[in-house]
């Protein structure tokens, strides 16, 4: 079998095109890693109603669950947070926003703010500032509920 120069040139011209396979997919970015904060945390929230009032209420403790969901494209530093409180003074569920500083690894400071429908018939406000470790969160809370101010603390452990 004799191969001509012409056939060899045609083969050399089309060989790179055959290897391409008709195009390809665009490069993909690496899948983002999950935040240590994402997921469900459970613990205790203690509330001091009207702490600066003439007759402050007694502190009330109850179980609480916080669930953090990462907001996409925020460098794992912003979260949609659901707080479910079974505290006798503040039995609420609220959806709030949480921001993490200075970075997205523990230990980090987290700030959470939100509003909720109070069982007392008003719109309440809730805020928290805490230190988040890999498996625990310890922080303070503050807010106003119809129009009673409150302060307190929260301690959470990751499930």
Where do the protein language model's features map onto the residues?
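C-terminal motif of bacterial Sec signal peptides marking the signal peptidase cleavage site
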Residues: 16-19
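Hydrophobic membrane-targeting and insertion signals
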Residues: 21-23
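Tryptophan-anchored aromatic micro-motifs
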Residues: 33-64, 81, 137
């Amino acid at each position: 079998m004799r191969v001509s120069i012409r056939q060899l040139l045609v083969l050399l011209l089309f060989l790179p095109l055959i290897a391409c396979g008709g195009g390809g997919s665009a490069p993909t970015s690496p899948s983002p890693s999950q935040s240590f904060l994402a997921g469900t945390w459970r613990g205790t929230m203690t509330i001091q109603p009207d702490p600066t009032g003439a007759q402050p209420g007694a502190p009330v403790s109850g179980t609480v669950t916080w669930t953090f969901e990462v907001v996409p494209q925020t460098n794992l530093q912003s979260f949609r947070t659901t707080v479910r409180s079974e505290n006798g003074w503040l039995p609420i569920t609220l959806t709030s926003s949480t921001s993490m500083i200075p970075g997205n690894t523990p230990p980090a400071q987290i700030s959470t703010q939100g509003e909720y429908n109070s069982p007392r018939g008003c719109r309440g406000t809730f805020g928290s500032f805490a230190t988040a470790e890999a498996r625990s969160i310890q922080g303070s809370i503050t807010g106003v509920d119809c129009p009673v101010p409150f302060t307190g603390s929260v301690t959470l452990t990751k499930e």
